[in-house]
């Protein structure tokens, strides 16, 4: 893979070249609207399979596994669903959807996938699967073949249709991770983290000694907001049997589906097992043009507390044109096993920065249709107030 660097995330320029050369191919063809600054959206195909369980096809093609019988001679596939006119995927059930896109990757290019922001904020668990692969959300270098998406709606029953994009694919070559020493230099020169409690017309970056770096930037949780009484600092998903049609924007009343969480006097929050929460970061983050980033869970401290679904940040995230720099990170949180008490300012997750192979043609923001470019604590685009 040629370029100005030997290691990096492929930009929209490279992605369009791969699409033109049919290394990323689909029927109907991949559109320009699917191409983001550092990723490409992947679309649902024409049918879904309702499965009895999740699986990984480590030593076989996925199409072969769909005919395997379990201990009681039941097929992995319970039934098929036609998605061409839209269909319902029920919460708590496992589905597998062949995607419209397939890839023929160069030998030095591999891929990784993540849910789109709206997918994560709806508590829809998705994972990319490929043939002969022992891992989720990863495509090995040189892979040639179809792509499949495992879908498990957790909080809400959803309606989907052929052509809808629930996840995105990022392609990379070499070792693009930014070292800790480079991250510190980058924060001093480009300012990666900003305080969130300042004047909205101003931006104050974190002092260098306050930036915690260890294979990425550590960020904290915000349970205080501006400190006023009755301020909303999060949301918890309600038990709701209504169907959320993912093709509708600004359609559903937020209070029918979400319970606001108000700031407590001691700035803490008790997370209950198997409840789903939307929270926000204490800091505002920026991703400079020559970099991309990915949010990862702070696993060492939280174990089974899942702190995100959607994790990609495109070049230009949080940059903006106004005086207020940086953007809060919205977190999707689902505790497991036991109640978990968190407090304002607690270290909660980590963002890993990676080099771009070259600068993208376009940066993240409203000009490319980004729904959350000026987000604070924000629900998915399907809800209204």
Residue ranges and their predicted role:
Residues 1-385:
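DUTPase catalytic domain/fold
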């Amino acid at each position: 893979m040629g370029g100005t660097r030997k290691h990096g995330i492929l930009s929209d320029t490279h992605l369009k070249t791969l699409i033109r050369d049919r290394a990323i191919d689909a029927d109907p063809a991949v559109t320009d609207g699917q191409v983001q600054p550092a990723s490409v959206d992947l679309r649902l195909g024409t049918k879904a399979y309702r499965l009895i369980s999740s699986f990984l096809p480590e030593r076989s093609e996925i199409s072969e596994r769909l005919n395997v019988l379990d201990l009681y001679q039941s097929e992995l596939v319970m039934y098929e669903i036609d998605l061409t006119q839209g269909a319902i995927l029920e919460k708590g059930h496992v589905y597998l959807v062949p995607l419209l896109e397939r890839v023929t990757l160069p030998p030095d290019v591999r891929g990784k996938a993540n849910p789109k922001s709206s997918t994560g904020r709806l508590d829809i668990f998705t994972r990319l699967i490929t043939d002969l692969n022992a891992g989720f959300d990863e495509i090995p270098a040189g892979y040639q073949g179809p792509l499949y998406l495992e879908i498990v709606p957790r909080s809400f029953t959803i309606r989907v249709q052929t052509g809808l994009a629930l996840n995105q694919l990022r392609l990379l070559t070499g070792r693009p991770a930014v070292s800790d020493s480079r991250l510190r230099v980058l924060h001093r020169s480009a300012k990666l983290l900003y305080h969130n409690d300042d004047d909205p017309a101003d931006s104050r970056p974190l002092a260098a000694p306050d930036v915690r770096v260890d294979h990425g930037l550590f960020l904290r949780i915000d349970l205080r907001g501006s400190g006023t009484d009755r301020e909303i600092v999060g949301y918890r998903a309600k038990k709701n049997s209504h169907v959320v049609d993912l093709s509708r924007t600004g359609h559903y009343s937020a209070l029918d589906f979400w319970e606001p969480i108000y700031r407590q006097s001691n700035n803490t929050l008790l997370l209950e097992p198997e409840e789903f929460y939307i929270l926000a970061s204490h800091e505002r983050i920026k991703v400079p043009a020559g970099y991309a980033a990915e949010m990862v869970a702070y696993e060492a401290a939280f174990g089974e507390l899942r702190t995100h679904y959607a994790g990609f940040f495109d070049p230009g995230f949080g940059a903006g044109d106004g005086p207020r720099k940086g953007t809060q990170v919205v977190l999707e949180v689902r505790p497991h096993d036991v109640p978990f008490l968190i407090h304002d300012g607690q270290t909660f997750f980590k963002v890993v920065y990676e080099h771009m192979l070259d600068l993208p043609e376009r940066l993240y923001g409203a000009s490319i249709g980004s729904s959350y470019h000026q987000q604070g604590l924000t629900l998915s685009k399907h809800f209204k107030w």
